[in-house]
Amino acid sequence: MPAQTPLASRRQAPPATRRRVSSRSALASFAHTVSPRLRPVLREAEAMGLRGDTRPALDLLIETAAALPSGARDDDRVAIGELAVVVSAWGSELIDAHPFLESLATQVSSPGARGALLFTRGRAGTAAETPEILQRALSEFRLAGDIRGQAVTLGELCWPREDGLSGDYRVTVGREGLALARRTKDPWAIAFCAGRLAGCETYLDRPEALEHWRDAAEVLPSSPDAVTAEIASLNQFNWAHTAYGHGNYALAGRVAREGKLLAHGSTWARKFAAVEALVQWRTGDLDAAAASARAARAGRPQMATGMAGIVLGAVALEREGRPDPKILDDSLGHIEFDEQMLWLALAVRATHRVARQEPFPLRDLPQALSTAAGMEVRFGWEDLVLVMAHEDPEQAREVLESMASLWPVNPRGIAVRLAVEGLVRGVDGHAVLLEAAERFRALPEPLTAGRLLHAAAGVAPDASTGNLLRRQAIELFQTHAADRSLAGVLRDRRLHRGQDLPAVPASQRLVATAGLTTREREVATLAAQGYTAQEIADQLHISIGTARNHVLRVREKFGGVPKRKLAQMLAEGA
């Protein structure tokens, strides 16, 4: 994407001075003349949202709209609707705002106002309904002759979602929207469309995506109003997110720190803290990652809560003997609209399930990969296949073949593909695993590198090479206090014992499994298939009392769920 303005000079400036400061308020709003009596209410609702009181803020806006006289300005309703979506997005009330926004759209008289409210409603919609709502908004903006409105609606249409549109079509629509935005010379419209197009390019793994996120983040001046600041923060956040996904951790960390400094309110500060936590986890600084994740979770549940929960779940798996997987289950509800984070959470949860010796630990992964393939996404799902390759190489081999055309070619994507190829090749994968480990070490992603070195040791051509690789893995895990991974290598029976080997970390001593014992796994597998206690006893040649005791212990380890619910939870493909 060519630069809209001479950006080279700004790129040379110190990070803190990159964004210009605008004296114009409500740069992003379609409401041009808001009534004087409404302005203090909008300021109060915004302040409540910035403090994290998003539900009361939304309630205030709904009550204010209901009290407007029938002849109130269209702009008043537009301003209320725009702010309602922003404060709802800061919390978890977007779905609650849907009926309100639809009602507002029926109360305005001009096509421009209807277009603005439908555009706002479309941005808050689900994947299935959004295209139709945005098409209605586009029609209204065309009736009004509003080029700016048409531009941002096309920009929103190009954003990747599970709606059946092809990736190439999205890029075409996004470029058209950006071209219209440039015609308006409106910085918010340009930033909005540039960011949505960069998001589309990211999911298609286009090499220019990272550069285009930088352009989108830098073009918009900082602004004191919430609606404009939302896109400024969103572009900065997605720039960091994309750099993280590419394995460019130095850039991701820097962009997240800059974003946190300029964040408009606690919600965005927490989201940037969550990105920092992800970077720290990947780069092996588990203590810092846990601290950043806890900071990101301080406040009302929202997307940052889920992102940080992924990190805390991953750190707990390394540091605790029997980590509670509930934090990952809870996190999924807060990140359902971000596929990149949703797939990462599923990958980490599958790793937990493997460590807990659950039946069918990969049960969520095939459906997630099918969704990615249906969306033609080439970014963010590769960790699902890496987890699969460690646990079920044959299944991973099938995925590797079926999704070959969608495999990401960014630096981390290439490293993951090499790792998967090495794991599925078995004894022939030694050299490929070593190459993958070196690529991960260079990112740096030391814990992933250590696991691949341990895997390479298992297929080494001779015992001496295998032990050398195990010791390299031990060094990485010990340096980064990755207790469970370290214990796994130390318990490897093929490891040559020596006086210089460290002891099994205290958190992993006397802990043979993170969850189920071997017998409990056998019982749980049969329970998942609907076997009764008597049938389990007959199948395993144990007494019915012993079978019932095992079922009871398994239920306790899954939070005390009833046996019928346990079977549903563990069912393969559930």
PLM feature spans:
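Internal alpha-solenoid helical repeat scaffolds
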Residues: 11, 18-279, 289, 308
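Amphipathic alpha-helical regulatory segments at dimerization interfaces
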Residues: 63-67, 103, 334, 367, ...
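Helix-coil-helix junctions within alpha-helical repeat/solenoid scaffolds
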Residues: 71, 212-215, 239-513, 531, ...
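Solvent-exposed, amphipathic alpha-helical segments
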Residues: 41-44, 418, 519-522, 526
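Alpha-helix N-cap/N′ positions at the starts of helices
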Residues: 36-40, 132, 172, 235, ...
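Actinobacteria-biased recognition of intrinsically disordered, low-complexity terminal regions
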Residues: 1-34, 490, 505-510, 573-574
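Helix-turn-helix DNA-binding segment
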Residues: 502-552, 556-558, 564-574
